[in-house]
């Protein structure tokens, strides 16, 4: 690993530690836009760098910080509320003993909540559940970035192998052209064999250029995601392979999207309780000391009182808020079912695609073996004038089609495996990024 890579890994680990400890706005280094050249990289390193750069991670981390601040705001309801107050201007009080004209007043007041039938506690619990939902959404964002990066990585590997196979096919066609030239020079075949082969080579060169352009595009996309341009990309880890019938063993309780929806449902339930508690009174202690400046004399007014605020009739506003909260809870509950449904659908489709790609890959492998055997036989028979140049070119086309089909099927399979692992929130552990369940955030090594 290069010095640049070590530095970036350290920076990313530090950034995640900051989020875990402070739950505040995130990575100061995620705004980097530069792309650094490196000799080689792996899928794990690419994902780590992408998470360090992706703005969506910082965005969701900031949302988590907002959630924590909302908890602090709700908890402040139990703290004493202290304020200074003052006024100036004409004020007159008249009673049986006469009139008192005040010109100014100032003082200090304090209010302490005693009991509110769950209003404040439910608000705290509601904000806590919402904060936990934001935490799981952050986990989901990390998984989404990992999936996006892994799919881009697979595309780079796909076009790297296709380009290499196309170049090998060009070289094979050049060997055929050389053989045709030798036979033409010896007078045992016409020069049209060589010309026909050159035409086929030109067509294959166009395919090479096409895959070169596709590879450059894939490398550019991955470079923007990771912030580095590697000369070599390691193979996709084999442990990403999808197990048969694994879709029937999905543990939804460990999937961030489901857990985020469940916590939003829990938050909505506390919202219902908060709305219902508005029917009940609020008991508080109020105290104050106020100085009045009057024409006749100045004096202090001290007070300490137990205050009760009990709603009697508000035009149905509280009942309407309860119904709104119950509707929000029903919506949140449906989101839990939707999250499970989305996970199952994505995982099921990915598993089916994986199985299909494995089958196509095996068929391509068998086709390639047959084409390679036919190539050797046809070359020998061509030198003995038992085969035409068209037979030789046809078998080279068969070799190319089998090779490209095998490569395409292989990387279609890896894309499906990545989609499956992301659906069940197992992508990062499979590539070596361990997750700390207690902290509910990835612990990157």
Where do the PLM segments sit?
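Periplasmic alpha-helical coiled-coil/stalk elements that build and connect Gram-negative outer-membrane
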Residues: 2, 141-254, 350-353, 357, ...
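Acidic, low-complexity, intrinsically disordered peripheral segments
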Residues: 2-4, 8, 27, 35-36, ...
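Bacterial N-terminal signal peptides
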Residues: 13-24
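Small/polar-residue-enriched beta-strand and adjacent coil segments characteristic
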Residues: 42, 81-141, 259-340, 346
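Amphipathic alpha-helical coiled-coil segments
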Residues: 59-74, 141, 145-168, 175, ...
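Outer-membrane beta-barrel domain signature
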Residues: 89, 95, 101-102, 206-209, ...
């Amino acid at each position: 690993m290069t010095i640049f890579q070590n530095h970036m890994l350290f920076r990313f680990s530090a950034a995640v530690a900051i989020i875990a400890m402070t739950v505040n706005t995130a990575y100061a280094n995620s705004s980097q836009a530069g792309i650094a050249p490196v000799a080689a990289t792996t899928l794990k390193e690419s994902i780590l760098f992408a998470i360090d750069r992706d703005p969506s991670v910082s965005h969701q981390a900031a949302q988590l910080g907002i959630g924590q601040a909302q908890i602090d705001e709700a908890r402040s309801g139990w703290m004493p509320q202290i304020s200074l107050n003052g006024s100036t201007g004409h004020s007159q009080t008249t009673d049986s003993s006469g009139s008192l004209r005040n010109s100014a007043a100032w003082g200090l007041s304090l209010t302490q909540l005693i009991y509110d039938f769950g209003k404040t506690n439910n608000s705290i619990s509601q904000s806590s559940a919402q904060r936990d939902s934001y935490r799981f959404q952050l986990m989901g964002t990390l998984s989404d970035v990992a999936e996006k990066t892994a799919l881009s990585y697979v595309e780079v590997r796909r076009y790297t192998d296709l380009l290499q196979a196309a170049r090998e096919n060009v070289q094979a066609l050049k060997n055929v052209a050389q053989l045709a030239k030798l036979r033409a020079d010896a007078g045992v075949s016409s020069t049209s064999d060589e010309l026909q082969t050159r035409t086929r080579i030109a067509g294959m060169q166009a395919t090479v250029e096409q895959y070169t352009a596709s590879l450059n595009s894939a490398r550019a996309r991955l470079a923007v995601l990771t912030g580095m341009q590697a000369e070599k990309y390691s193979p996709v880890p084999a442990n990403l392979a999808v197990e048969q019938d694994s879709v029937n063993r999905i543990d939804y309780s460990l999937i961030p999207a489901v857990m985020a929806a469940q916590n939003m449902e829990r938050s909505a339930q506390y919202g219902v309780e908060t709305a219902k508690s508005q029917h009940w009174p609020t008991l508080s202690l109020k105290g104050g000391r106020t100085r009045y400046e009057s024409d006749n004399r100045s004096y202090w007014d001290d007070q300490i009182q137990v205050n009760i605020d009990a709603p009697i009739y508000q035009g149905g506003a509280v009942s309407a808020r309860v119904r709104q909260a119950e509707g929000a809870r029903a919506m949140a509950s449906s989101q839990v079912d939707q999250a499970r449904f989305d996970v199952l659908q994505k995982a099921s489709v990915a598993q089916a695609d994986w199985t299909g790609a494995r089958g196509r890959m095996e068929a391509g492998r068998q086709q390639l073996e047959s084409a390679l055997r036919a190539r050797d036989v046809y070359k020998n028979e061509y030198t003995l004038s038992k085969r035409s140049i068209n037979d030789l070119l046809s078998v080279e086309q068969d070799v190319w089609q089998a090779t490209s089909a095998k490569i395409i099927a292989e990387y279609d399979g890896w894309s499906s495996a990545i989609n499956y692992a992301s659906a069940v929130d197992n992508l990062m552990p499979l590539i070596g990024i361990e997750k700390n369940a207690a902290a509910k955030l990835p612990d990157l090594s």
